[in-house]
Amino acid sequence: MAIKSYKPTTPSRRFYTNVENNDITSKPSVRSLLVKLPASAGRNNNGRITSRHREAGAKKLYRIIDFKRDKFGIAGTVSTVEYDPYRNCRIALITYVDGEKRYILLPKGLNVGDAIIADATGVDIKPGNAMKLMNIPVGTSVHNIELKVGKGGQMVRSAGTSAQIMGRDGKYVSLRMPSSEMRLVLGECMATVGAVGNEEYINIVLGKAGRTRHMGIRPQTRGSAMNPIDHPHGGGEGKTNSGRHPVTPWGKPTKGSKTRRKKASDKLIITRRKSNPKR
């Protein structure tokens, strides 16, 4: 896949780029694997905004993805490669020999017609196959990694990402995450071999505000452009600085201030991810 640019027929079209969709199969999605998610638009059950700058966005249906990969010992074939409006990578429709169909995240190098299989005891090391971390050789790239046994993959699911198995420590396996963080994960947890596909997604330029609105993101107003009643940075004559360190609308420090609470799982983190040197 490559980045596709367009002729500047309009100002918004000038910088607009997208990923070519030559890999997408022109077949309809499986209706039994589609579900309509309610659009909360950042509101809670009382209708109050709990997450700012959110809206419904373009209409879309959620594809039920098999993150658990718990269909052990049954081979499947990639029937189609499809676009998923809820994620930045492609998804693959897998048709198993017993007739069942499931969606999985499309790994890099997996094409229509290829065969895959998942098994807890270990299978061939090739993209799309899933097994326990303890059975994957050191140095292998993996994605869709479980944090808890049987819960389904929670880590490394974004387009173009992968984690690398660095070694084993008792019942744990050490992983180097895409953020450069080194952490331990139980060897009983499942993972899929290979890197997530659509690695060119990071190079896309949205090019216009409307494209962000389609994604369900509303505009953000600067605090310095508000009144003092609305934001700690507000007020003043003309364009003035805030006169204090950057804070949120509720007065809490922001822009580099650490907010992560300590958790019991901190002991599994060997090396923290690298912080932004510009901050």
UniProtKB/Swiss-Prot annotation:
Biological process according to GO: cytoplasmic translation
Annotated region (Disordered), positions in chain: 218-279
Report if keyword Ligase is assigned: no
Give the keywords, sorted: Ribonucleoprotein, Ribosomal protein, RNA-binding, rRNA-binding
- What GO annotations for molecular function exist for this entry? rRNA binding; structural constituent of ribosome; transferase activity
Gene3D superfamilies linked to this entry: 2.30.30.30, Nucleic acid-binding proteins (2.40.50.140), Ribosomal protein L2, domain 3 (4.10.950.10)
> Ribosomal protein: is it a keyword of this entry?
yes
Regions of biased composition (Basic residues) lie at: 255-279
For this record, an example GO cellular component is: large ribosomal subunit
Extent of the signal sequence = none
InterPro entries linked: NA-bd_OB-fold (IPR012340), Rib_uL2_dom2 (IPR014722), Ribosomal_uL2 (IPR002171), Ribosomal_uL2_bac/org-type (IPR005880), Ribosomal_uL2_C (IPR022669), Ribosomal_uL2_CS (IPR022671), Ribosomal_uL2_dom3 (IPR014726), Ribosomal_uL2_RNA-bd_dom (IPR022666)
Tell me the domain of life.
Bacteria
Q: Name one Pfam family in it.
A: Ribosomal_L2_C
Q: What does this protein do?
A: One of the primary rRNA binding proteins. Required for association of the 30S and 50S subunits to form the 70S ribosome, for tRNA binding and peptide bond formation. It has been suggested to have peptidyltransferase activity; this is somewhat controversial. Makes several contacts with the 16S rRNA in the 70S ribosome.
Family that this chain belongs to: Belongs to the universal ribosomal protein uL2 family.
Subunit-level organization: Part of the 50S ribosomal subunit. Forms a bridge to the 30S subunit in the 70S ribosome.
Q: What is this protein called?
A: Large ribosomal subunit protein uL2
Read off the lineage from the record.
Bacteria, Pseudomonadati, Campylobacterota, Epsilonproteobacteria, Campylobacterales
